[in-house]
Design a protein with these regions (language model features):
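Short, small-residue-biased leader/transition segments that mark boundaries at the very start
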Residues: 1-7
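Structured C-terminal helix/loop/strand segments within mature extracytoplasmic catalytic/sensor domains
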Residues: 4, 17, 100-101, 105-106, ...
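Active-site-proximal beta-strand/loop segments in catalytic clefts of secreted hydrolases
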Residues: 9-12, 59-60, 87-90, 101-102, ...
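Acidic helix-start/capping segments at beta-turn-to-alpha-helix junctions
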Residues: 12, 51-68, 102-103, 170
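Active-site SXXK
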Residues: 26-55, 86, 219
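Short, well-structured active-site flanking segments
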Residues: 42-61, 109, 160-163
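Conserved catalytic neighborhood of penicillin-recognizing serine enzymes
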Residues: 62-97, 105
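Mid-domain, small-residue-enriched loop/turn segments at the edges of structured enzyme/sensor domains
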Residues: 78, 96-155
Length: 248
């Protein structure tokens, strides 16, 4: 199966502006890290967590692709630094450490359920959650559900204004999604995004973007089951982005 799915929502009204296969399940891959940091910020807002709390960890905690956490084995990292690493650099150990603070994958799923998302689910940790087995519902979402959830996190009342701004700031500082939507972005456009990559040709991105420096729409794109190389998958998403912008 080769599949791509997409959903675009107006970030103010929530109205679906364009969609393709919006209610099919695809693996979330690292795009879940935005939802995870949203859950962490929710705990901060409730007084159950502190962004400045330092978390110490060991070599045994490190998993594949941990470019930031591997440099801080001696001094540890704060919750704020871990969220930044998870979103801006897609650091997998940072994500696992943050998952531990909220109680694991099931608690992230429960958080999403409580905010009205009965579709998106996280079942495993990094890096196993990127396995992307066909017809496996573990660690998946649907683009319409993800678009709605992302909109609620970034513009709704679920998080405080400060936490909403913090989440979008981390996404705006994303350093690993350059070849995707960002490569098609005209000067002056705003983008805050998070990409994901997995096995079996899986690739994805969730983003808030728009002209005049303002995020006016939520864009969610996932693809899986492709034989394409990573460069080809990146180019495919960039081309979708260019088309979206052309017909904005």
């Amino acid at each position: 199966l080769v599949g791509s799915e997409m959903c675009i929502r107006d970030s103010n009204s929530g109205k679906i502006l364009e969609s393709f296969r919006p209610e099919e399940r695809f693996p979330m891959m690292s795009t879940f890290k935005v939802l995870l940091c949203g859950a962490v910020l929710s705990r901060v807002d409730a007084g159950q967590e502190q962004l400045g709390r330092r978390i110490h960890y060991s070599q045994n905690d490190l998993v594949e692709y941990s470019p930031v956490t591997e440099k801080h084995l001696t001094d540890g990292m704060t919750v704020r630094e871990l969220c930044s690493a998870a979103i801006t650099m897609s650091d997998n150990t940072a994500a696992n450490l943050l998952l531990t603070t909220i109680g694991g994958p099931k608690e992230l799923t429960a958080f999403l359920h409580n905010m009205g998302d009965h579709v998106t689910r996280l079942d495993r940790w990094e890096p196993e959650l990127n396995e992307a087995i066909p017809n496996d519902e573990r660690d998946t979402t649907m683009p319409a559900a993800m678009a709605t959830t992302l909109r609620k996190l970034l513009t709704g009342e679920l998080l405080t204004l400060a936490s909403r701004q913090q989440l979008i700031d981390w996404m705006e500082a994303d350093k690993v999604a350059g070849p995707l939507l960002r490569s098609a972005l005209p000067a002056g456009w705003f983008i805050a995004d998070k990409s994901g990559a997995g096995e079996r040709g899986s690739r994805g991105i969730i983003a808030a973007l728009g002209p005049d420096g303002k995020p006016s729409r939520i864009v969610v794109i996932y693809t899986t089951g492709s034989q394409a190389t990573m460069d080809e998958r990146n180019r495919q998403i960039a081309e979708i982005g260019a088309s979206l912008i052309k017909h904005w």
